[in-house]
Design a protein with these regions (language model features):
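Long, low-complexity, charge-biased intrinsically disordered regions
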Residues: 1-283
Length: 283
């Protein structure tokens, strides 16, 4: 499979680059069972948050950086094939510049282009099975320190600590942890960094307001939690290339022509992709 490089501009104007594995062709032979990772259900996120508010728990959210590469691929053999990634063009130059002694001797020329073939040893972004491999690692590590997983949701785990329940729910590498004692979250944060912080600090958000999975959870009022997606919706509008004004408002999209195809000109590829992205974010 080939490597791809994506450059995106963040909201603060900085440019973020990520080299990923082009896993799209692997859909032909990877089954859903071998590539799909479970994620916490919306019902679980909401119900556990209500419990947090009712019990007056301390909440903490975390993001594990570079989570996927901390999961090893299965070793070749026993039905497992080696995974080879093809790197071409400017990406080869970048790698050679970073570590000439490592990559330089293995660069070859194909059709006038520099090519580098590497064996993939760990899960990387773009692999269909990357999130599942990370899930197995994280679940195993949580179970080793005494967490028991909810039989109805494989991404919610609980542990009895100081006589009270410690709850962790997660969506891939985004976590929310809660316990009545802030000290428990302090210790859990230290454990996360000790376990996964070698590729970047596992940062924590503490306090009464948390931005988690595109939602804002506000525990400021005792015994209650308020959930909204105002910031998420605002970012959708800001990122949309067509700028909307105060008069661009409809009471409902369910007009008489909602399901009529019409004969308008189709969107070009760029705008079609943008349209699909915005619709997907709104679902």
């Amino acid at each position: 499979m080939e490597a791809l490089m994506f450059l995106t501009e963040k909201r603060d104007g900085t440019i973020k680059g990520r080299m990923v594995y082009n896993g799209k062709p692997t859909r032909e032979w990877l089954s859903r069972e071998d590539s799909s990772s479970p994620t916490a259900s919306t019902e679980s996120i909401m119900l556990t948050s209500v419990i947090d508010a009712f019990e007056g728990r301390d909440d903490m959210t975390n993001d594990v950086p570079n989570a996927f590469i901390q999961a090893h691929l299965p070793k070749p053999g026993d039905g497992q094939a080696r995974v080879i990634m093809k790197i071409t063009g400017v990406l080869v130059d970048m790698l050679v510049k970073l570590a000439p002694e490592v990559y330089g001797p293995y660069v070859v020329m194909e059709n006038g282009r520099k090519v580098l073939y590497v064996q993939v040893l760990r899960a990387i972004y773009g692999m269909l099975q990357a999130s599942l491999l990370w899930y197995k690692v994280f679940r195993k590590d949580l179970e080793e320190i005494g967490f028991e997983f909810n039989p109805y949701d494989p991404c919610v785990a609980n542990k009895e600590t100081y006589g009270s329940q410690h709850t962790v729910r997660f969506h891939v590498d985004d976590l929310m942890s809660s316990h009545k004692r802030p000290k428990v979250n302090d210790n859990f944060h230290r454990w996360l960094n000790k376990k996964y912080g070698s590729y970047g600090e596992v940062k924590a958000t503490r306090g009464k307001v948390h931005d988690y999975l595109g939602m804002t959870f506000d525990f400021s009022e005792e015994g209650k939690v308020k959930v909204d997606m105002c910031d998420y919706m605002a970012s959708m509008v800001d990122d949309f290339s067509i700028k909307l004004g105060p008069d661009d408002i409809e009471k409902t999209p369910a007009a008489d022509d909602l399901f009529k195809e019409g004969d308008d000109v189709l969107l070009d590829k760029r705008r079609a992709e943008e349209f699909h992205t915005v619709v997907a974010k709104g679902l």
